[in-house]
């Protein structure tokens, strides 16, 4: 048996393969900010601003956004988070704007009635003479 030439271990990788594998770079893109799920805002909307179940819809989309974020699907999480934000804004507007408009109408109506009452009191306190009827 001739053992004069060096033998290579068949299980050991060659130096060329090791160098190529050691310097391989993968470009994954720049990681952006994690998408927001607006969970706390959705819970608040569900508890206090749940007109037409918009707060509940916001909560459902917030849970879906959190699930997608945990699963690693950031684009779907961003979409669900955006929908949750829109439903939270709608729930807040539909719950807070009508009472504020009603309050504004009551205040302006009260001011108008007080002016009208003052003018009518001045009208009825006027004393007419006999000459005014002739």
Swiss-Prot record:
KW Zinc (keyword) present: no
Induction section of the entry: By interferons.
Outcome following mutation: residue 86 to A: No effect on location at the cell membrane. Abolishes palmitoylation
GO biological process entries: bone mineralization; bone morphogenesis; in utero embryonic development; regulation of bone mineralization; response to rapamycin; response to tacrolimus; skeletal system development
InterPro entries linked to this entry: CD225/Dispanin_fam (IPR007593), IFITM_antiviral_protein (IPR051517)
Effect of residue 42 to L: Abolishes expression at the cell membrane
Further facts: Membrane topology is controversial. The N-terminus is cytoplasmic and the C-terminus extracellular according to PubMed:24715519, while both the N-terminus and the C-terminus are extracellular according to PubMed:18442316.
Name used for this protein in its record: Interferon-induced transmembrane protein 5
Native species: Mus musculus (Mouse)
